[in-house]
Amino acid sequence: MLYLILNPMLKIQEVKAKSILNKSKIFDYCLNPYTGCEHNCAYCYARLFMRRYSGHSEPWGEFIDVKINAPELLRKQLERAKKGTVWISSVCDPYQPIESKYRLTRQCLEELGKKQFPVNIQTKSALVLRDLDLILQFEEREVGITIATDDESVAKLFEPRASTVKERLDALEKIHSKGIKTFAFIGPLLPGNPEKLVEQLEEKADRVYIDRMNYISTIRGFYYRYKLTGAATEKFFSEYKQRLVNELEKRQMRYEVLF
């Protein structure tokens, strides 16, 4: 069993949500068992609006609201919901460290499995392996892992509390080996070796999605602080994308560029 160590400085509070299965513009529904994300990724778009939305004064990455009634609420909503694909999750990582304690994502998967709602799971955590037994019970399921760079030091800088690159690659390989449809999300494009990254993804990901750094103006100071300003330019995104595409095509891997 994989247990993750929680950040002792994290402010955690248990709350009761009013809704857990919500309409999405990307999939039919999205499901977020938590408000806040301990991974604290420097580039996360959620930090732009979720602190204000949640009413927290703490910086993004330093608070989590645990929706303790999520499984019960989901069970009720599924009784009247039209079947559709559920994205887990849109504004938090469903397998962030606190999930090893509360198991809300697992309990929600149990409810979704009873109704056979298709699921699309996206994470940066190897903790997803804990729930392979449940995921395998879905007739329609897809699991994606975000791997924005092959460089462990860069990943640690931008995604300080997420699983290591190696842990994510190993998880993706194991999930794929079980016959589950998989994808790798290379986004946002971070410094690294694109050819090596694609090589590592071969025979692990059925499809690769590529996206650039969005909201660059809000994170420019972060790049400047760590002397990475050259990786925050249109030239970098364009050239890095092309190197990824060239290597993907060379290896005849399916991909989609999202910008």
Residue ranges of model-derived segments:
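A general structural detector for well-ordered alpha-helical segments in enzyme core domains, enriched
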Residues: L73-L74, L104-C108, D131, T164-L172, ...
